[in-house]
């Protein structure tokens, strides 16, 4: 009699590739050999690429939800994170999700593919203005978290910064002496985090620039130029975990939407090239008050899938049941998709990985 353990590797791979990412842990428990196999090989990655789907995570009803996007619409894959506290922010790096909990004391690092969870307790209670980012040391792949704490006074300067080290399981203060303000829009790439930043010096212009936190050197790099002169209305994303992408568009002052991607990117240097420029005047139904948020690009089809932030900050569950994603491409291609109104105005693009770390129990 044939058992689950007798199935060929190819057939097991086909079965596992059809399982939603957040359900893999439950499926692994059904067969020891399946569990071993899936912890040494990523299934489903080729299928995502073949179907031109984008996998991402967001927060809905204070739960982490996985979503799949393609040019036909959006699908909610379900949620396997229900019993691990209420979450209000999620950040992706290296196949790991850094989840910030609503109790303002605990962080959770989660590998959805492997099902590993690590609870981390903050050194002191944090507020909604505190920003957390995840990265790693490029010399030894040791993962770290940086926390930048803000107190919104007349200067709006960061008050302190701390780093959590996975190897030592401890926090320590770091000196950064900032004269800039970091926007919440940030992206992880090759172990480092790239932020939009703005000078706070009285005689400085307020134009945005790019700023990288290097997790290997544990310091911020120099100001990196953006490809457009922008004071707002710019959003970051990444392409295949290899390049940064930038979306610029303000239809109150401009008639086009621009997507730029990096030719070169490291903590100390960047160069850009235009990927897509769309004239939005002919697009019937394009909103006048469009406020671009998280986005994904399809390099082959030259389209962008972008989340409209307009009204999110002023919405409640009573007056906002749905928000919209817009799919925009060359030659006037334009359509929209409704999505349930989320707690977080951002999506974290996700790429599965086999990164492992020492799991911990619930952090009290």
Swiss-Prot record:
Pfam families membership: F-box, FBA_1
Superkingdom to which the source organism belongs: Eukaryota
Transmembrane segments: none
Record-linked SMART domains: FBOX
Organism: Arabidopsis thaliana
NCBIfam families listed in its UniProt record: F_box_assoc_1 (TIGR01640)
Listed name of the protein: F-box protein At1g59680
InterPro entries recorded: F-box-assoc_dom_typ1, F-box-assoc_interact_dom, F-box-like_dom_sf, F-box_dom, Gal_Oxase/kelch_b-propeller, SCF_F-box_component
Domain named F-box: residues: 2-49
Gene3D superfamilies (alphabetical): 1.20.1280.50
């Amino acid at each position: 009699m044939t058992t689950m353990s007798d199935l060929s590797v190819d057939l097991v791979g086909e079965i596992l590739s059809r399982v939603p990412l957040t359900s893999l842990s439950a499926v692994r428990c059904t067969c020891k050999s399946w569990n071993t196999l899936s912890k040494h090989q990523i299934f489903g990655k080729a299928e995502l690429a073949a179907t031109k789907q984008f996998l991402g995570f967001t927060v809905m009803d204070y739960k982490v939800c996985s979503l799949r996007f393609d040019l036909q619409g959006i699908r909610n894959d379900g949620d396997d994170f229900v019993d691990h506290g209420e979450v209000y922010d999620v950040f992706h790096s290296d196949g790991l999700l850094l989840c910030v909990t609503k109790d303002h004391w605990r962080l959770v690092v989660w590998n959805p593919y492997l099902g590993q969870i690590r609870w981390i307790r903050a050194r002191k209670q944090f507020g909604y203005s505190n920003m957390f980012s995840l990265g790693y040391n490029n010399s030894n792949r040791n993962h770290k978290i940086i926390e930048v704490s803000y107190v919104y006074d007349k200067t709006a300067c960061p008050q302190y910064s701390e780093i959590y080290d996975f190897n030592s399981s401890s926090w320590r203060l770091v000196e950064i002496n900032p004269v800039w303000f970091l926007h919440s829009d940030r992206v992880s790439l090759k172990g480092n985090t790239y932020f939009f930043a703005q000078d706070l010096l009285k005689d400085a212009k307020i134009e945005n620039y790019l700023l990288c936190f290097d997790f290997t050197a544990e310091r911020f790099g120099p100001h990196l130029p953006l490809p457009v002169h922008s004071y707002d209305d710019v959003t970051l994303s990444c392409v295949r975990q290899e390049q940064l992408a930038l979306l610029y568009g303000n239809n109150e002052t401009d008639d086009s939407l621009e997507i730029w991607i990096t030719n070169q990117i490291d903590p100390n240097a960047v160069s850009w090239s235009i990927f897509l420029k769309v004239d939005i005047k002919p697009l019937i139904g394009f909103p006048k008050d469009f406020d671009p948020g998280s986005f994904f690009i399809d390099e082959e089809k030259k389209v962008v899938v972008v989340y409209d932030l307009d009204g999110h900050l002023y919405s409640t569950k009573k007056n906002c049941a749905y928000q919209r994603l817009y799919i925009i491409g060359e030659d006037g291609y334009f359509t929209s998709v409704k999505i349930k109104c989320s707690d977080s105005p951002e999506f974290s693009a996700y790429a599965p990985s086999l990164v492992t770390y020492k799991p911990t129990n619930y952090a009290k």
